[in-house]
Amino acid sequence: MNIVVITGASSGMGREFAMQLDRGLHSVDEFWLIARRGSRLKEIASGMQHTVKILPLDLTNEADMTVLTESLAEEKPVVRMLINCAGYGMMGDFTAVPIKEQTGEVDLNCRA
């Protein structure tokens, strides 16, 4: 099974990638949409032509990363495209942001 995986798919660039690729990409069987907000993923999936696997996961959470890893291992899809749009940012003086938040932001932006 050929799939497209999109993280951060519930809004912004992730959502837009899902919508645009759904219309123009015919060489894949399924889209895997990943984001924290499952209800938004369901809304997006309802408007898509392709089969969609909804994964309401928080990729900053190790248990949720395990769910994703296990899903990939179990189903063994061919990932034709990986679009990493999950992420967050903080505004303001970085010295006022706790180091845990800073490293969490970098970690998510690199892994997801």
Regions found by a protein language model. Name each.
Residues 10-11:
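Conserved glycine-rich cofactor-binding loop
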